[in-house]
Amino acid sequence: MNTPLKSALCLLLAGAAFGTPSGLNNIPTADTVPHRTVAVQYFSSFGGANQFGTGEPGKSGHWMGFKSGWDFEPIHLEWGMDSPLGTGVSGPLFFQTKARFSPWEDGMFAIGIAGIALTDIDRAGDPFSYAMLAHDFGFARLHAGYGYQTNGSSYLFGVDRTWKLFGRNFNLNTDLAQTRDQRGLITAVGAKYDLTKHIVLETWANFPDRDAVSLIAKINFVFTF
């Protein structure tokens, strides 16, 4: 069943959280993957309709992808691909990229595009273009921006903060995005933890204004070259 909420999320958030520690939950950020670093990701969804749901609400969905970063001072570039997996219909394969620079100390600005279908174009939906601004105030980082997509545009807001837990980074965050062509809202609360130098764990809960709560679990395998 392709519910309206699920359709809106798939369109709106196709590029927002497709998969790396460089974003929050349901929104992109101005962060980029570090230079010559690759993050290979596997993530699953549980519960209600969400942007990673490949079946009916209540059934889990599975995705796999990667992202990499290149630095061309003062511009930092990120690019990647991901795709839903399944025993039935898999795909489409999506491409996304963004470029970031720092306009002032502790500030970042990025423009990007996501959800560019390389396969199964007819059932993939339109790409999602966005601009994001971030500033680190010390007590927290604030994120704000706007994403454009046919019938799926959204203002995007987020807050995050990182602490040390057992000597490794532990991040708590929340974000807010619009759904249903700016007539609905979805809030998410999540956490990230650097389990090792090469493994980053992520999880978050989605709280839409309609439909049931859903959960996302993700593991990132990070290495440099």
Stretches with model-predicted labels:
Residues 124, 128-150, 154:
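Membrane-proximal helix-loop-helix units in multi-pass membrane proteins
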Residues 156-160:
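Alpha-helical transmembrane segments in multipass membrane proteins, preferentially the mid-helix core
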Residues 19-129, 136-138, 162-171, 175-179, ...:
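Transmembrane beta-barrel domains of Gram-negative outer membranes and organellar outer membranes
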Residues 1-24, 225:
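Cleavable N-terminal export/targeting peptides
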Residues 9, 113-115, 140-145:
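Short, flexible active-site loops
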